[in-house]
Amino acid sequence: MRAVGYLLVFSFLATAASAADYDKTEKTKAYEIRLRIAGAAIAIPKLRDEIMARFKKDTKEIQELSTSDLKEMPQYFHPYAFDADWKVTFENDHLISLSSNNFIDENGAHPNGAFDSIVWDKRTSRVVPFHELFAPGKAPAAFKAIAAAARKAWIKSATEKAGDAPDDSEADQGIGADENKLGHYALTYAKGDTKANGIVLLYGPGEIWAHVLGDFRLSIPMSVFREYLTPAWRAEFK
């Protein structure tokens, strides 16, 4: 019994440790890169590996360019930086959605930002592409409806930020009826719910529009695209 007890305690401690938030910084004279990941994602090995791979890809150029710039023009140099902070936007027993608002400083006039996101199916251990939410042949119509709602949300947000209504065509720079022109999508939910209530489309400052406008987080309620969802995905939304 004592051995079993120790085994159970060890198992509990291992699970708790695996669910701890991850926070690691690498700092040199040329750059400082930091990666933070919510414990819920760290507890899923393949998801953790996906995030680590993205971070490695995103920081490769930062590391190379900063090291080169420090060597070639030290008098004008300040360290480059990249900070990714992955947070959960929704989770239930078989899905988890995360987003990261990345801070990027490449020794330019000002730092930049860029979002990234992942919707992960725990059952199949893979990223869910946006179009897979929709029934066969329905994705184009779904993206058209989502783009229309996103355009309205962007114009409202841009007007509030700038004080004047932008030209409607400005929205088209980053919004279109194509999953590659709908930012980075993540699932959203109301506190206490176990089902999603919509999606959010994420755009970092300077990623598409003028940096001075900051980032855009365009909330799209499920009612906009409900009719296009597969039966399985319809069941995931409230």
Label each region the model flagged.
Residues 5-15:
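Bacterial N-terminal signal peptides
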Residues 18-238:
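Compositionally biased intrinsically disordered regions enriched in Thr/Gly
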